[in-house]
Curated annotation (Swiss-Prot):
Source taxon at top rank: Bacteria
Name this polypeptide is given: Uncharacterized protein TP_0675
Organism: Treponema pallidum (strain Nichols)
Keyword field: Membrane, Transmembrane, Transmembrane helix
Topology of this chain in the membrane: Single-pass membrane protein
Transmembrane segments: 27-47
GO cellular component entries: membrane
Length: 332
């Protein structure tokens, strides 16, 4: 008994029962909420997975679409050589290009305008740095010098004053010109011109492209130059490989184009030792594709249409941008 004269135990019993009843009610409410929320969470998880962008390969030549929940990223694969046949576009490609909210290329339009002057500064800076180094030509055999002379003429002596990569770039352009494939009539040049005053954004920085051109130390640059000289010694073979690249592009044969692109990359680093080939491919392809994969996913989440034009080799064959997106769960 307490001071009120009422039994303690019945009061305690009622209080405990009341609290137990409240606890049971709360537990029931929580349980009910869980039952209601779980299907919703499951639904959200399904929606999240389903919201990943999907890849569509359109019937138009080397034309893909990454379709996201908010917008689409259309990708036109290109090749660096040129001919009139390559400039015959299907209507849909140009319609999408003209109506796109955003335009992207490997290099943005502003960087394209500034590239020549930036490249010249890099060349001069390198020449001053190697002022006391032996000329590039002194590292080459008589047979290699003959090949350079027949391709570059007297310009090879001027080019020898710069770092070896400069002669390599000049030689590659000369070899392309000898195939009669006019690089001035390529797809990229056409689309830059068609864009007019519209801004084209860059997938890469101008610094990245300079790093690709000037890849390696002096000895490695000479190794890459000699590999290109070896390729140029068989002009018919080189022309045949570029011809195969053009044919696979025109026929929209993505498998063949991926194979030819990979073979050409391997030939320009032929016999390179010490992991040079692996590091070169990482610089010109692997690292860029990884960055593009992230960028394409980001763009697919934006409203509107993004149009991208870039080398088709990055989208065909093994370890393509699309493969990387799938591995990183950025694409269905």
């Amino acid at each position: 008994m307490n001071t009120t004269g009422r039994p303690v135990f019945p009061l305690l019993r009622r209080t405990v029962l009341k609290r137990c009843s409240l606890c049971a009610t709360r537990c029931a409410i929580v349980f009910l909420c869980v039952l209601l929320i779980l299907p919703f969470l499951s639904c959200c998880t399904s929606l999240s997975r389903g919201a990943l962008p999907s890849l569509i390969s359109h019937k138009e030549r080397m034309f893909w679409e990454i379709r996201g929940p908010q917008g689409s990223v259309y990708i036109l694969g290109t090749i660096s050589v040129g001919s009139e046949k390559l400039l015959h576009f299907q209507d849909k490609i140009l319609d999408v290009f003209d109506s796109a909210s955003r335009l992207y290329a490997e290099l943005g339009s502003e960087d394209i305008k500034n590239f020549a002057s930036v490249l010249q500064r890099r060349m001069l800076h390198g020449m001053l740095e190697q002022e006391n180094a032996a000329p590039t030509l002194s590292s080459l055999s008589r047979e290699e010098l003959e090949m350079l002379r027949s391709t570059l003429g007297d310009d090879m002596h001027t080019l020898s004053r710069f770092e070896p990569w400069v002669m390599r770039v000049a030689l590659y352009q000369a070899l392309i010109a000898h195939t009669k494939l006019d690089s001035g009539k390529n797809i990229e040049a056409f689309l830059y011109q068609r864009a007019g005053n519209r801004k084209i954004l860059g997938l890469d920085s101008i610094q990245k492209h300079l790093n690709m051109l000037s890849f390696g130390n002096r000895e490695e640059q000479i190794t890459l130059l000699r590999a290109l000289i070896a390729l140029g010694k068989s002009p018919a073979d080189f022309k045949g490989r570029l011809g195969a690249l053009v044919r696979s592009y025109l026929s929209n044969d993505k498998t063949a184009l991926g194979r030819v692109s990979t073979e050409l990359d391997a030939l320009v680093t032929k016999d390179a030792a010490g992991g040079l080939h692996r590091r070169y491919v990482a610089e010109i392809a692997a690292s860029r594709r990884a960055a593009w994969a992230e960028e394409f996913y980001r763009l697919s989440l934006q409203h509107g249409i993004t149009f991208v034009f870039a080398s088709a080799g990055h989208f065909c064959g093994p370890e393509s941008v699309f493969d990387i997106m799938r591995k990183r769960r950025l694409l269905q």
